[in-house]
A protein has these predicted regions:
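HAD-like aspartate-dependent phosphatase fold
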Residues: 1-120
């Protein structure tokens, strides 16, 4: 499998963690998804975390909060042992994302990575 075929892009908020009232210091992991990320990492996957966090509070100017957002997410990942290779900020803030390769978090958590094949 080539490198792209073993790369996943994963949203952060309400995908790998839950947060109440934007209290990111007290975010809680979505255990089933984090467990699947650990499994994926141990099987050689590259994990890119891509988030729209900060886009609202910066009015779409992510450079104003980029360092803060990356530090919030890196701290969470360290605290809860969430594997990742890179944190990418600046995902457009939207009500809906339409993507032919998308999975809902519960679908991902139940996915058999050994018998899954990508749509490239």
């Amino acid at each position: 499998m080539n490198q792209i075929a073993k790369t996943m892009v994963v949203d952060v908020d309400d995908t790998i963690l839950t947060t109440v009232n934007r209290d990111y210091a007290n975010s809680k992991p979505i255990v089933e998804v984090v467990s699947k990320l650990r499994e994926a990492k141990s099987n050689g996957w590259t994990i890119l975390l891509h988030t729209a966090r900060g886009m609202g509070r910066s009015n779409g100017k992510i450079e104003l909060v980029q360092e803060e957002v990356i530090n919030e997410i890196a701290s969470f990942c360290s605290k809860w042992d969430v594997p990742y290779d890179e944190i990418i900020v600046g995902k457009p803030w939207a009500a809906m994302y339409v993507d032919d390769k998308a999975l809902r978090p519960d679908e991902f958590a139940n996915l058999d990575l050994n018998n899954w094949s990508p749509r490239l």
